[in-house]
Design a protein with these regions (language model features):
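Conserved alpha/beta-hydrolase
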Residues: 54-78
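Catalytic nucleophile-loop/oxyanion-hole region of alpha/beta-hydrolase
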Residues: 74-101
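The serine-hydrolase catalytic nucleophile loop
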Residues: 43-56, 234
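Short beta-strand element of the alpha/beta-hydrolase
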Residues: 34-42
């Protein structure tokens, strides 16, 4: 399966939210066997990146299901990036997972997508523990998506607080507080600055994870570059310490950067996915 063939997949669109907050989310679905794969991308990225396409190609070669999508304000989805918050993007992640995934899933989250994957796992655990879930029929339970495991690539849980707000100068914090937005220079993509809003920072505080144990109920594989300028390796260690001790593996790639998109990095990511299922 060539990358050009993968790119020719037409996206499906779903509506998430209601009223003024309704937005159209672009989803690409590859039918196949379980365990399926679902890709959760990073902040200000899209589902056509190197890692996402490589995973989709790997799934296609093995007849595995694969789901990719763009958050609102990203890629082919509707909505404005400036309106984005962690809760808003989590709502979209849950909607895509529930609508397009069936059976066990390997959730692969990159950077912010790592935070999304952890929040998604927590949300799934809450729903499975609900009285409604226990009363569901055997057929409906078999059709429901579940977690086979998480593969987290340079995961950035709590990044709005720990890696942004706490690292900003008082001048930048003041601008965000007073103007509601700060344009941050970017070293990726076209290099254009992108908006960081007060809403992103403040709403993100509703979803912080690193202050207590994180129960995900499945195996976790973490891949982290020691040379990552955006998510320091210490952040990955802090996350690993918050996860259950059983079946959590942290792989430190000594010469790896934030993107982890080199051929050798892709090979490690795919190996982690294959190890889970």
């Amino acid at each position: 399966m060539t990358n050009s063939a993968i790119n020719d997949q037409e996206p499906a669109f779903i509506e998430v939210g209601s009223g003024d907050s309704q937005r159209k989310i672009a989803v690409r679905v590859r039918a196949g066997a379980a365990p399926g794969l679902i890709w959760l991308g990073g902040f200000n990225s899209d589902m056509k990146g190197t890692k996402a396409l490589a995973l989709d190609a790997w799934a296609a070669e093995r007849g595995r299901a694969c789901v990719r999508f763009d958050y609102s304000g990203h890629g082919e989805s509707g909505g404005s990036f400036i309106d984005g918050t962690i809760g808003r993007w989590l709502e979209e992640s849950v909607a895509v997972f529930e609508q397009f995934c069936r059976g066990p899933q390997v959730v692969i989250g990159s950077s912010m997508g790592g935070w999304m994957a952890l929040l998604l796992a927590r949300e799934i655990a809450r729903r499975e523990a609900s009285p409604a879930a226990s009363q569901a029929s055997a057929v409906s339970q078999a059709n429901r998506a579940s977690l086979a495991g998480l593969v987290l690539i340079a995961p950035a849980p709590d990044f709005t607080e720990q890696l942004m707000w706490n690292q900003f100068t008082p001048e930048i914090q003041q601008e965000i507080q007073t103007r509601g937005v700060w344009l941050r220079p970017s070293q990726y993509g076209d290099g254009d600055p992108y908006p960081l809003t007060r809403a992103l920072i403040e709403e993100g505080r509703n979803h912080l994870l690193l202050g207590s144990a994180i129960e995900v109920g499945c195996p976790v594989r973490i891949l982290q570059g020691a040379q990552d300028p955006d998510v320091p390796w210490q952040h990955a260690f802090a996350l690993a310490h918050r996860l259950p001790t059983e079946d959590v593996v942290l792989t430190m790639i000594q010469d790896g950067d934030h993107r982890l998109s080199r051929p050798q990095d892709i090979a490690r990511i795919i190996a982690a996915v294959a190890e889970i299922g």
